[in-house]
C-alpha cells in the first residue's frame, strides 16, 4: 500500500514537470495522430464549457434536449454533500482504495439518489469555480502549488495481459496549460506515461491514472449481493469530499474514441452481463463524446478525506481480488481473440475502433458498450444495408430533443450488452443469478430520482453532432454485423444437426434462430443453458428500443420466439408441400384407358390367315416354297378343299361380320375395341427389278392357252375349263390380230396366273428404229411366242387385213377393253366393298400417297355400288407424279394417238360421247413407279386372298412388248422407263416454258461470257411451242424410247427454242410526259389594279381539260404558277404494216390558256387644268393661274373590252409534242420558253358605240406574255413499268435507286444452296448494288452471280426457324446457327453465314435487307434516268474544266 502511494506521489510530480513538453509534442502530432483532441482556451470558457465540465464529471450520456442554455440548468457533479468550495483547501487525509471506490459509487450517476442536484448551492459553487478560472486566465498568474500532502490511492497492481498498442486512437490524454515553472516537464511526463505500454505503466514507478482505475473498481460489484448493492446505491449518506483547484488554463475536449486497456475489455453485442454489472458499469462515462472519461482525465485532483470510510465496505477489496483473478484467467484463455480485438492495424484501417452503441440519459443504468470492428477476424462483414436494417429501429436519434424521448430514456431499465464470440467463457464465469423483483425495485427507485432533475446537455456544433451520428451509425452497423454472423453460424449448425427435432427442443437448446432481421438475436448457448431468464432478457435487448422496458421486452421476446417457431414450422411444411407438388407435377394426369396393344407377332390383322396387305415382298422369289405368300396360298387351297364354307374369302360364303371389319371401323373404336391390330410400320419398300431377270409369258405358250398350274390359284377367272377364260382368250387373240398397237395386256405374277387377271387397253409405243406402221398387226403365233429379254424382237406382219376400230374391238366380246374391267365378271360385289373399306383406312394413314395435279378421277364412294376398281379411280395417286404429268394432254390429242387412219370424224365424235357416258370402272394395278430406274414401290401383296399384280421390270429392253408392264393409268405418260438425265434447261418434257433463274452459275475463267447454266431447285415446265404442238397433231404418237442421236437432236431443238425471240411487246402507251408550268412573265396588260383582275390557267391535252383556281392577277405582270401536269403519250395511229420501229403517225398537242376576269370601272379619273384668278389691279388686267386636277368622269369606253375573248381568254400557248420534242426531254429535265399569243383582241371603234363588239375587226395575233415550262419524258420500255403521278416523286425514286447502287460490301461467307447441291462452301462475296457475286475462296474466280432483284425477303435465324416450323437438323444448327437466308420469288432459298463477329453478320444482314427493300425503286426508267443524269454531270464537269483551262 505504501509503495503504491509513494508511486502516485512521484508520478504527480513528474506530470507537473513534464507538462510543457507533453503540450509541445501533442501540438506537433495532434493534427495527425489525434484529430479529435483540441484545446479550448480559458478565455473562451463560458456556460457551454461549464456544461461540458458537468458532463465530464457526472458521467452522463443523455441525449440533447431542447432546453439549451437555460438558467435553470442544474449540474450533477456529485451528490449534494459535495462542497465545491473546498476545492482550494489542501487535504492531507489519506484514503484507502475502498473508501475512494465507495465515494465514487455514491457520487456516480448510478446512484439513484439524485435529488440533491436541485440544490442551488451546487450551482453557485460551479459558477464560482468558473469565475476563478476566468480570473486566473486574465491575470496570468501562476497558481500557487498546493502544499497539501499528495493524494494517496490504494491501487492493486496487476500484471499486464496484453501488448498495449502505442496508437493515438487508444489514448485518452488531456493537455492542460498551467503557469507552473515545471509545466513542460510535467506535461512531457504525462504524455510519455499515457503513451507507454501497459508493461511500463504497471511498473512500481509509473502507474497510469486513466479510466482503467475506474473500470477495475467497477469489477468489485460483480460479487455484491443485491441487498448490499441496493443499499450502497440508494444510500443518501454523503461523504465530505475535497478537491483541488484546476491546474489548467484550457480544458480540451476528450477524444471520441477512448483507449481500450486490458483492464477495460471491449464488450460486444452478444454478451449478456448481469444487471449489477450493467448498472454500475456506467461509472466510466461522463461525456457523449467520451463516455469513459473520469475525473483523472480532467487532472482535477480529488483529495477525498475520511479514509475511515473505507471500512464501511470491507468486502470490496476481497471481491476485487476474486474478480480480477477470474478475469486474468479467462482473458489468458481467450488471448488470441483479444489480440485481434486490440490489433492496431485493423483499428487504424477501419477508422474509429471503439464507438458507443448509444447515448443514454442521465439516470439510465445501462452500460456504454464498445464494439471493436476488428474483434474477431473471422467474423463475416455484412453490408451496410443489412446492418442498418437490423439495428436502426432499435435506437433513437442521437440529436433528439423532445421531452418524450427524454422521459423514455429515464424510464428505460433495459440492459443492452454485447459480447463477441471469443468472450463467451469470460461472460459465462459470472454466474450471478438475477432476481426480477429486485431489478424492478431498483428500476422504480432510480426512476424516481431521475424524474427529479434532468440532465444538462451542452450545445454542440452541427459538425460535432453530425460526426457523432455517423460514428454511432457505424457502430450500430458493426454491432449488427457481429450479431448477424453469430446468428448465421448458429442457424447453420441447428439446421444441420437438429433438423428433425421438435421446435420446443430447439428453443431449449438455444438452436432456434430467427430469420427476420427485426427479431432479437439469440443468446449464447452456455448462458441459455444456465438461465432461461437471462436468455429471454438478452434476446429482447437486441431488438428493443431505448424507450422499451425489460418486462415488455421479455414478453415480446417470447412472442417473437413463438412466432419464429411457427414460421419455421410453416416453412418446413411449405417446403414439404412444394416437394410433393413437384413430385406430383412430374406425373401425367390420369387419362382415359388406352387400348391395349398386343405384342408384335404374326397374327392376322383382318382375322384372315391369308391376308398379307401389309407385307412387301420381293416378287422374284414369290414362287419358292419358303416364301410366305406361297405358303399362305398353299394353306388357303388346303383349307378350301376341306371346307369351302369355313373360309371368309370363299366364293361359296356370304358376307359376314368378320369379312366386313375394316381398318376404318377399327380406328373409330380404337379406344375400346378388342381388335388385335398388328403394329407393323408399313413403308414404301422398294423392290429391285434387275434387267437380267427372264420373264415368262406362259399364257401364250400354245394354241390351247395352257395356263400355268398353280395349286393355290383356285379363284383364277382365266383358269382352264371355264367359258370366261376361253372368251377372254378369244378376245385377246382377236385384238392381237387386228390391233397390234392397241391390245389387252395381261396381268401376271412371275409367269404364273395371278388371282385375278384383268385386261385393259394399253398403247404400245413402237421403237423408233422399227417404224411399225399403224396398219400392221401381229400374228397369233407371234403373240403366243415366249419373248425373252434379249433373244427376239417384236416381229411385224404386212398382211393387208381390215383394221378394226376401237369400237369394234370393244364390241367383239363381253369385256370392255377401254376400261379393262374383267374382274366384275367373275367376282362378287362384296369384295369391292371390303376393298373400299381398306381404301378408307388409307385415307387416315399418315403415309398416304400424293395426289397428282392431273388426277381427273375422283373417289366414287357410292354406298349402293362399290367395286374393287374404285381403288384405281380414287384420288389416291399411287406414285409420285413426275414433272411430265404437270400439264395434262388434251383429250383430242390423246384420241388422235389411239385412233386409226380410217376413222372419220363422226366415228370419233360417237366414241367420245360413249366414253363420257360410260361408267369409269377401269382397273389399274398395285405397282408404283418412281423416276429411279429399275425400282418400283411395292404395296400390299394380297388383299383378302387376292393377289395384286406386279410387273416383272420397270425397264423394257429393246424387243420386249408392252405386255410385260402394266402402268398405273390407261394411257400413261409417253416416256416412263428410260429416264434420261434431265436438267433445268434440257428436259425431256413435251411441254416446256422458259423461266429465268434468280442466280446464274458463272463458268470459271470467263465471267463475262453468257454461257450460264440456269439453276433451279425444282423443275418448271416451259410453255408448249408451236412446233411441238404440230408434232402432237400428227398421226404417229410420240415415241416411248429414243436413240442417243434422236435425244441429242431433240435437245438441240429445245436449246434453240429456249433462245428469246424478238417479238415486240405491246405497250399501253409510249410513256409519261411531265409538264411543269413555272411562270408567265412580261404580261402586256395594264390597268390591273383598277379592274381588280383575276386569272386562271387552263390545261388541255386533247382528252382532258384541267383548270386551276382563280387567283388575283399581280400588278407587276409576272404570274408565278408552279403547276404540274401529267400527260400520258399515246399512239395516235399506225399503219397496218408498221413495225415496232416505224414512226408514229401523230402526237398530242398541249394547249395552255390564260383566262382573266375583271370589273369595269364605274368612273374614270381625268386630268383637267383649271384657270384660277389670282388678283386684279384697279386699272389692270386680271391675273390667272392654272391648276391641274383629277376628276372622276364616266368613261366613254374601256380598252379591256377589246382585249379578251368572250370566255375571258387573253393568251394561249400550244406545245406540239412530236418525236423531236420527246427526244430532247427524254429522261431529262429541260427548261423551255414559249410565247403566249393573243388572237382575240379587236381594233377599237373611233366612234364609241357605233358598232357592236363582234363587228369590230380583230387584230393580228401578237405576243402578250412569255411562258416558262419544265418538261421531262419517261419513255416506257416495259409493259409492267409504273410511273409516279407527280414529277416531284421522280427525284425521290432516283435518289433511292442511287442509294441502292452505292451499297457495297465484301467478305467471306458460307453458302448453302444455289449452285451448291448437298454441300456447303466458303466463298468470297462482293455485294454491289443489287448484284451479289461469289468467287472462289482462294483463286477468286467467279462462281456465281445472284440477282437480288428477284429476292423477296431476307430472313434472320429466328425467322428461318419460324418459317420452317422450327425443325432444323444438327448440321444447320452448328454451321448456320446465326445465319441469314435469301428467299427468291420462286421459292428458291440460299443460306449464308459469316465466320466473323456478330457486328459483321448484322452488317451483312442489314445491307442485304436494305437492298431488297429498295428493289421497289428498281425499274428500267429509273436506271435510264440515272444514266442520263450521270452523262449530264460528266458533260458539265468537262465543260467547266475546259473553261478553266481556257482562262
Curated annotation (Swiss-Prot):
UniProt modified residues of type Phosphothreonine: 365
GO CC field: cellular bud neck contractile ring
Annotated spans, Interaction with IQG1: 768-879
Gene Ontology molecular-function annotations: GTP binding
Domain of life: Eukaryota
List of residues that carry Phosphoserine: 10, 78, 81, 91, 96, 167, 367, 511, 616, 805, 811
Domain PH: start-end pairs: 1302-1413
InterPro entries: Bud4, PH-like_dom_sf, PH_domain
Induction section of the entry: Cell cycle-dependent with low levels at START and a peak in mitosis (at protein level).
Compositionally biased spans, kind Polar residues: 22-32, 59-76, 277-316, 497-509, 538-548, 649-664
Keywords linked to the UniProt accession: Cell cycle, Cell division, Phosphoprotein
Post-translational modification remark: Phosphorylated by CDC28.
Gene Ontology terms: biological process: axial cellular bud site selection; protein localization to bud neck
Region (Disordered): 1-37, 57-76, 272-316, 444-588, 649-672
Compositionally biased spans, kind Basic and acidic residues: 1-16, 475-494, 549-580
Disulphide linkage map: none
Family, per entry: Belongs to the BUD4 family.
Record note on quaternary structure: Interacts with AXL1, IQG1 and SEC3.
Function: Required for establishment of the axial budding pattern in haploid cells. Cooperates with other bud site selection proteins to recognize a spatial landmark during mitosis and they subsequently become a landmark for downstream polarity establishment factors that coordinate axial budding and cytokinesis. Involved in the septin organization at the bud neck.
Name by which UniProt lists this protein: Bud site selection protein 4
Source species taxonomy: Eukaryota, Fungi, Dikarya, Ascomycota, Saccharomycotina
Amino acid at each position: 500500500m505504501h509503495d503504491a502511494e509513494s508511486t502516485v506521489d512521484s508520478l504527480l510530480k513528474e506530470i507537473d514537470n513534464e507538462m510543457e513538453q507533453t503540450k509541445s509534442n501533442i501540438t506537433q502530432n495532434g493534427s495527425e495522430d489525434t484529430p479529435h483532441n483540441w484545446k479550448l482556451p480559458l478565455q473562451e470558457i463560458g456556460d457551454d464549457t461549464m456544461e461540458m465540465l458537468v458532463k465530464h464529471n457526472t458521467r452522463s450520456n443523455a441525449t440533447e434536449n431542447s432546453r439549451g442554455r437555460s438558467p435553470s440548468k442544474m449540474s450533477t457533479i456529485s451528490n449534494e454533500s459535495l462542497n465545491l468550495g473546498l476545492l482550494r483547501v489542501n487535504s492531507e487525509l489519506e484514503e484507502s482504495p475502498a473508501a475512494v471506490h465507495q465515494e465514487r459509487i455514491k457520487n456516480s450517476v448510478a446512484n439513484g439518489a439524485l435529488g440533491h442536484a436541485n440544490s442551488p448551492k451546487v450551482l453557485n459553487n460551479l459558477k464560482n469555480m468558473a469565475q476563478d478560472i476566468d480570473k486566473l486566465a486574465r491575470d496570468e498568474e501562476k497558481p500557487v502549488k498546493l502544499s497539501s500532502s499528495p493524494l494517496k490511492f490504494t491501487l492493486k497492481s496487476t500484471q499486464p495481459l496484453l501488448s498495449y498498442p502505442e496508437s493515438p486512437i487508444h489514448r485518452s490524454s488531456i493537455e492542460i496549460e498551467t503557469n507552473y515553472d515545471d509545466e513542460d516537464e510535467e506535461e512531457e511526463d504525462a504524455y510519455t506515461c499515457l503513451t507507454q505500454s501497459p508493461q511500463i505503466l504497471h511498473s512500481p514507478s509509473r502507474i497510469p491514472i486513466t479510466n482503467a482505475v475506474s473500470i477495475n473498481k467497477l469489477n468489485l460489484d460483480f460479487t455484491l449481493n443485491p441487498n448490499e448493492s441496493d443499499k450502497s446505491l440508494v444510500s443518501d449518506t454523503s461523504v465530505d469530499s475535497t478537491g483541488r483547484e484546476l491546474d489548467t488554463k484550457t480544458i480540451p475536449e476528450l477524444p471520441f474514441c477512448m483507449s481500450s486497456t486490458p483492464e477495460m475489455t471491449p464488450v460486444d453485442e452478444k454478451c449478456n452481463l448481469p444487471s449489477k454489472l450493467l448498472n454500475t458499469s456506467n461509472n466510466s462515462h461522463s461525456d457523449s463524446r467520451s463516455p469513459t472519461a473520469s475525473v483523472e482525465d480532467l487532472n482535477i485532483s480529488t483529495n477525498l478525506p475520511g479514509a475511515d470510510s473505507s471500512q464501511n465496505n470491507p468486502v470490496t477489496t476481497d471481491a476485487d481480488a476474486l474478480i480480477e483473478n477470474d478475469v486474468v484467467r479467462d482473458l489468458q484463455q481467450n488471448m488470441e481473440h483479444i489480440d485481434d480485438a486490440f490489433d492496431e492495424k485493423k483499428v487504424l484501417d477501419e477508422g474509429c475502433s471503439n464507438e458507443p452503441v448509444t447515448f443514454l440519459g442521465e439516470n439510465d443504468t445501462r452500460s456504454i458498450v464498445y464494439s471493436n470492428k476488428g474483434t474477431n477476424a473471422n467474423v463475416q462483414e455484412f453490408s451496410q444495408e443489412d446492418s442498418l436494417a437490423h439495428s436502426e429501429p432499435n435506437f433513437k436519434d442521437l440529436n433528439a430533443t423532445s421531452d418524450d424521448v427524454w422521459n423514455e430514456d429515464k424510464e428505460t431499465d433495459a440492459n443492452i450488452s454485447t459480447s463477441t464470440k471469443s468472450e463467451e467463457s469470460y461472460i459465462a464465469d459470472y454466474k450471478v443469478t438475477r432476481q426480477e423483483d429486485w431489478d424492478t425495485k431498483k428500476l422504480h427507485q432510480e426512476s424516481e430520482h431521475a424524474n427529479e432533475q434532468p440532465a444538462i446537455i451542452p450545445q454542440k456544433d452541427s459538425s460535432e453532432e453530425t460526426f457523432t451520428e455517423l460514428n454511432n451509425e457505424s457502430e450500430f452497423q458493426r454491432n449488427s454485423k457481429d450479431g448477424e454472423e453469430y446468428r448465421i453460424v448458429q442457424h447453420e449448425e441447428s439446421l444441420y444437426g437438429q433438423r428433425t427435432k421438435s421446435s420446443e427442443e430447439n428453443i431449449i437448446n438455444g438452436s432456434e434462430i430467427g430469420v427476420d432481421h427485426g427479431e432479437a438475436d439469440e443468446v449464447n448457448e452456455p448462458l441459455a443453458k444456465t438461465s432461461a431468464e437471462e436468455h429471454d432478457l438478452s434476446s429482447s435487448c437486441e431488438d428493443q428500443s431505448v424507450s422499451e422496458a425489460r418486462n415488455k421486452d421479455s414478453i415480446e421476446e417470447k412472442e417473437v420466439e413463438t412466432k419464429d417457431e411457427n414460421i419455421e414450422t410453416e416453412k418446413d411444411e411449405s417446403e414439404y408441400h412444394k416437394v410433393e407438388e413437384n413430385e406430383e407435377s412430374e406425373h401425367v394426369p390420369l387419362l382415359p384407358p388406352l387400348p391395349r396393344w398386343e405384342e408384335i407377332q404374326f397374327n392376322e390383322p383382318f382375322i384372315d390367315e391369308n391376308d398379307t396387305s401389309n407385307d412387301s415382298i420381293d416378287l422374284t422369289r414369290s414362287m419358292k416354297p419358303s416364301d410366305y405368300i406361297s405358303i399362305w396360298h398353299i394353306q388357303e387351297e388346303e383349307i378350301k378343299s376341306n371346307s369351302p364354307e369355313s373360309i371368309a374369302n370363299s366364293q361359296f360364303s356370304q358376307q359376314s361380320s368378320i369379312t366386313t371389319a375394316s381398318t376404318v371401323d377399327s380406328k373409330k373404336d380404337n379406344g375400346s375395341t378388342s381388335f388385335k391390330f398388328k403394329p407393323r410400320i408399313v413403308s414404301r419398300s422398294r423392290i429391285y427389278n434387275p434387267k437380267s431377270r427372264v420373264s415368262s409369258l406362259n399364257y401364250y405358250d400354245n394354241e390351247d392357252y395352257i395356263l400355268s398350274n398353280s395349286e393355290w390359284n383356285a379363284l383364277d377367272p382365266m383358269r382352264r375349263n371355264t367359258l370366261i377364260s376361253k372368251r377372254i382368250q378369244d378376245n385377246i387373240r382377236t385384238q392381237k390380230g387386228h390391233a397390234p398397237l392397241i391390245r389387252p395386256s395381261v396381268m401376271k405374277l412371275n409367269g404364273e396366273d395371278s388371282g385375278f387377271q384383268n385386261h385393259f387397253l394399253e398403247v404400245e409405243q413402237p421403237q423408233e428404229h422399227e417404224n411399225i406402221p399403224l396398219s400392221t398387226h401381229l400374228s397369233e403365233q407371234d403373240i403366243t411366242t415366249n419373248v425373252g429379254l434379249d433373244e427376239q424382237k417384236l416381229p411385224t406382219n404386212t398382211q393387208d387385213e381390215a383394221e378394226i376400230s376401237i369400237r369394234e374391238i370393244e364390241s367383239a366380246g363381253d369385256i370392255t377393253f377401254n376400261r379393262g374391267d374383267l374382274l366384275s365378271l367373275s367376282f362378287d360385289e362384296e369384295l369391292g366393298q371390303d376393298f373400299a373399306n381398306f381404301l378408307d383406312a388409307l385415307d387416315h394413314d399418315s403415309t398416304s400417297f400424293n395426289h397428282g395435279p392431273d388426277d381427273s378421277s375422283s373417289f366414287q364412294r357410292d354406298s349402293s355400288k362399290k367395286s374393287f376398281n374404285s381403288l384405281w379411280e380414287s384420288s389416291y395417286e399411287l406414285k409420285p407424279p413426275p414433272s411430265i404429268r404437270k400439264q395434262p394432254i388434251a383429250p383430242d390429242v390423246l384420241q388422235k394417238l389411239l385412233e386409226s387412219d380410217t376413222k372419220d370424224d363422226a366415228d370419233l365424235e360417237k366414241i367420245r360421247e360413249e366414253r363420257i357416258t360410260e361408267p369409269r370402272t377401269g382397273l389399274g394395278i398395285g405397282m408404283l413407279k418412281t423416276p429411279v430406274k429399275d425400282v418400283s414401290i411395292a404395296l400390299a401383296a394380297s388383299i383378302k386372298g387376292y393377289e395384286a399384280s406386279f410387273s416383272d421390270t420397270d425397264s423394257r429392253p429393246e424387243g420386249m412388248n408392252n405386255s410385260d408392264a402394266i402402268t398405273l393409268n390407261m394411257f400413261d405418260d409417253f416416256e416412263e422407263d428410260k429416264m434420261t438425265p434431265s436438267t433445268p434447261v434440257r428436259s425431256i418434257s413435251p411441254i416446256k416454258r422458259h423461266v429465268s433463274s434468280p442466280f446464274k452459275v458463272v463458268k470459271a475463267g470467263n465471267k463475262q461470257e453468257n454461257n450460264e447454266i440456269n439453276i433451279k431447285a425444282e423443275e418448271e415446265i416451259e410453255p408448249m411451242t408451236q412446233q411441238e404442238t404440230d408434232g402432237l397433231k400428227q398421226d404417229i404418237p410420240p415415241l416411248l424410247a429414243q436413240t442417243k442421236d434422236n435425244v441429242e437432236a431433240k435437245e438441240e431443238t429445245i436449246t434453240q427454242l429456249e433462245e428469246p425471240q424478238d417479238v415486240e411487246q405491246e405497250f399501253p402507251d409510249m410513256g409519261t410526259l411531265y409538264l411543269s408550268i413555272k411562270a408567265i412573265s412580261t404580261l402586256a396588260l395594264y390597268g390591273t389594279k383598277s379592274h381588280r383582275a383575276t386569272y386562271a390557267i387552263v390545261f388541255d391535252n386533247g382528252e382532258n381539260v384541267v383548270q386551276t383556281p382563280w387567283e388575283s392577277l399581280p400588278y407587276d405582270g409576272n404570274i408565278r404558277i408552279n403547276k404540274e401536269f401529267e400527260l400520258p403519250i399515246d399512239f395516235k395511229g399506225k399503219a397496218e404494216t408498221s413495225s415496232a420501229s416505224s414512226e408514229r403517225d401523230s402526237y398530242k398537242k398541249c394547249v395552255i390558256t390564260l383566262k382573266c376576269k375583271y370589273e369595269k370601272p364605274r368612273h374614270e379619273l381625268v386630268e383637267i387644268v383649271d384657270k384660277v384668278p389670282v388678283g386684279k389691279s384697279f386699272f389692270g388686267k386680271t391675273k390667272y393661274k392654272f391648276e391641274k386636277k383629277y376628276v372622276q368622269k364616266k368613261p366613254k369606253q374601256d380598252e379591256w373590252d377589246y382585249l379578251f375573248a368572250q370566255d375571258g381568254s387573253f393568251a394561249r400557248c400550244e406545245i406540239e409534242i412530236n418525236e423531236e420534242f420527246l427526244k430532247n426531254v427524254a429522261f431529262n429535265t429541260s427548261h423551255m420558253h414559249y410565247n403566249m399569243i393573243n388572237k382575240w383582241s379587236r381594233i377599237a371603234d373611233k366612234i364609241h358605240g357605233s358598232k357592236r363588239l363582234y363587228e369590230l375587226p380583230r387584230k393580228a395575233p401578237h405576243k402578250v406574255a412569255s411562258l416558262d415550262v419544265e418538261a421531262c419524258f419517261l419513255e416506257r420500255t416495259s409493259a409492267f413499268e409504273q410511273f409516279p403521278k407527280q414529277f416531284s416523286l421522280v427525284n425521290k425514286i432516283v435518289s433511292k435507286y442511287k442509294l441502292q447502287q452505292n451499297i457495297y460490301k465484301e467478305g467471306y461467307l458460307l453458302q448453302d444452296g444455289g449452285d451448291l447441291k448437298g454441300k456447303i462452301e466458303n466463298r468470297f462475296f462482293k455485294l454491289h448494288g443489287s448484284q451479289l457475286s461469289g468467287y472462289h475462296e482462294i483463286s477468286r474466280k467467279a462462281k456465281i452471280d445472284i440477282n437480288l432483284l428477284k429476292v423477296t425477303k431476307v430472313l434472320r435465324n429466328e425467322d428461318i426457324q419460324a418459317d420452317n416450323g422450327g425443325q432444323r437438323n444438327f448440321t444447320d444448327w452448328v454451321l448456320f446457327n446465326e445465319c441469314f437466308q435469301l428467299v427468291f420469288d420462286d421459292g428458291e432459298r440460299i443460306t449464308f453465314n459469316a465466320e466473323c463477329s456478330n457486328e459483321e453478320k448484322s452488317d451483312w444482314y442489314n445491307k442485304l435487307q436494305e437492298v431488297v427493300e429498295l428493289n421497289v425503286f428498281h425499274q428500267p426508267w429509273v436506271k435510264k434516268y440515272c444514266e442520263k443524269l450521270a452523262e449530264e454531270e460528266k458533260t458539265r464537269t468537262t465543260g467547266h474544266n475546259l473553261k478553266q483551262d481556257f482562262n
